[in-house]
Amino acid sequence: MNYSLEFFPPKDQESFKDFIDQARLLSIFSPEYMSITHTADTVDNNQTMEAVKILKKNLSVEIKPHMTCINYSKSEIMEMAQNYLSLGVDSIVALRGNTKQSVSNREPYYDNSLDFIKALNAGFDIRVSISGYPEAHPESRGVIADFIHLKEKSDAGVDEIITQWCFSNDLILRYRDLCYARDIKIPISPGILPISDIKKVKYFAKLCGSTIPVEIEKAFLNIEGNDDAAEDLGVQFAIQQIDDLLNEGIDNFHLYTLNRGDMTRKIIEHFEAPNRIKTVSSEMKAS
């Protein structure tokens, strides 16, 4: 079993210590990499890059930033990529992202992830991961169109598909089989989200077009108000989901940590002890 871990960058300096503590807690399990979601107002005010800097400085785990292209000019996004390479990053998650501004009267920009991926591979010696959607992208034009686009991105030079979190293994396995049927042979890492707050997960599921199986929702509603029981149940569901996918031949997983190392740690410990305990300084500075 191989796994990667996803974090989001802290919103302020006060949150950095806990962020670092959670990353350090999980680094002893030797994940394939830690990815950091994209949060940046401008090229110069990039919280993701600050998080990458501190983790690269203090951990011997591969750090993989997410990059979204639609809110930056072509020159800005290429500058950002170069800045990451200067930090020793050699792999990124390339995404289109959601627009935050009017697209009129702007410098030329990449309005889709395919062109962005092509530009990254043409300009840099870099490995690229992309997103996948077992339940279809919210802006899906249909299954055929989605997989034509995915095949184009695969052929443009991609090393991995990280899926949106999905609680249905049937949908994940169907997605894998559809990829293979269309000669998309790059590794697929299903996204696994341990649930602790069912109301928050329902809210985000609505935004991204994901579904929550009725039996899972009912199980959490039956213990509403008991946070400890909810966390235990979330861990149990995640373990069962991974177990079932392992039995179907899938052995790469992307764990959405939500910056909470405790639940993720319990899931990993179910499958393996730490592969290698690293020596990490206890005095990690957010600078």
In which residue ranges do the predicted regions lie?
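Conserved, mostly hydrophobic/aromatic
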Residues: E6, M34, Y84, K153, ...
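Active-site beta-loop-alpha junctions enriched in small/polar residues
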Residues: F7-P10, T37-D41, H66-Y72, G97-T99, ...
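Glycine-rich, positively charged N-terminal anion/phosphate-binding segment
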Residues: F16-R24, T42-V61
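Active-site mouth loops of central-metabolism enzymes
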Residues: N2-D18, I63-S75, S129-A145, N222-Q236
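Glycine-rich, proline-tolerant flexible connector loops at the mouths of alpha/beta enzymes
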Residues: S30-A51, G97-P108, V158-I172, T257-G261
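Short, acidic/polar
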Residues: Q13-L26, T48, K74-Q82, R141-E152, ...
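Active-site pocket-lining/capping segments in soluble small-molecule metabolic enzymes
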Residues: E14, P108, N112-Y133, D183-V235, ...
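Glycine-rich anion/phosphate-binding loops
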Residues: C69-N83, E107-D111
